[in-house]
Amino acid sequence: RGDRIVGARCRRTHPGGGVERLTVWADHVFVCGGAVHTPALLQRSGIWRNIGNGLKMHPTIKIAARFPHPVDHGDVPMHRVTEFSPFVAIGGSASRKGHIAMALADTGAPYDEALADWDNIAVYYAAIRSEGSGRVAALRGVRSPLVTYSLTEADVSRLARGLVHLGELLLAAGATELHPSVVGGRIVHRLDEMGSWWDEVTRARANLMTVHLTSTVRMGENRGRTGADSFGRVWNYRNLRVNDGSLIPDAPGVNPQAAIMAIATRNCDQFLAAQ
């Protein structure tokens, strides 16, 4: 109603399958759905100005590495190589059997042969600071939002560089076989076989992933470039706030969890102090 949000309409599904439609009335509304679903919810509510644009992330390429001995799959290894920061970071990834099977699929090696002695295999990543950006758009009649992202030529080059550096590290650590997350990519056993990776990493062939999504409701004081002010209040609405990773203006090159928690705490403190 005007410059105020008065509540939210939602549906609750009961254990028996019944659906109940609810309206929750509120004096203040905080949207915390993450960098994909926060902008999608705002867009479905008719709020589009600087909402959903500028999606940022850390595009990530991986290698499944086979060692001559079993490796520990109990947890995600907390090791990280920052020698090539701020543009490339290298580290360990989740390596349970399902993750390994998925990581081995890209090169086209015979499945049973590749997965033999799977407990000798672990997955590692190279993530980049990306110059590209993306968009989140809620489409009429479609339940899930459309998410798109465009890599630049520099991004593709950094991904290839990260893959090669990661391969060099793993061979030095004793790996005997490297499967890159590149469709049809060469399986490498020695350093002198790695040169082909530079040309194999393309937009069409690289099988990338990311877990760090930000920047779809950027915070700041320039209304022409941001979706919310510096404390997460959505422009043109007195009582509507965003308080999640959508606010971070760029992907920071590291896990943004601590930054998100710090910003959310600061925004809550500012809100409570004003009441």
Language model region names:
Residues 4-6, 144-145:
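Hydrophobic residues embedded in beta-strands of well-ordered beta-sheets
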Residues 19, 39-41, 73-74, 134-137, ...:
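Short helix/loop capping segments that flank catalytic or ligand/cofactor-binding pockets
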Residues 1, 7, 175-250, 257:
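A glycine-rich dinucleotide-binding beta-alpha-beta segment and adjacent secondary-structure elements
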Residues 48-170, 177, 202-215, 235, ...:
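FAD cofactor-binding and catalytic pocket of flavoenzymes
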Residues 18, 34, 158, 211, ...:
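Secondary-structure capping and boundary motifs in well-ordered enzyme cores
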Residues 165-173, 264-275:
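Internal hydrophobic alpha-helix adjacent to the cofactor/substrate pocket in enzyme cavities
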Residues 1, 8-82, 244, 259, ...:
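Glycine-rich loop(s) and the adjacent beta-strand/alpha-helix scaffold that form part
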Residues 30, 166, 219:
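Conserved hydrophobic/aromatic pocket- or pore-lining residues that grip, position, or stack substrates
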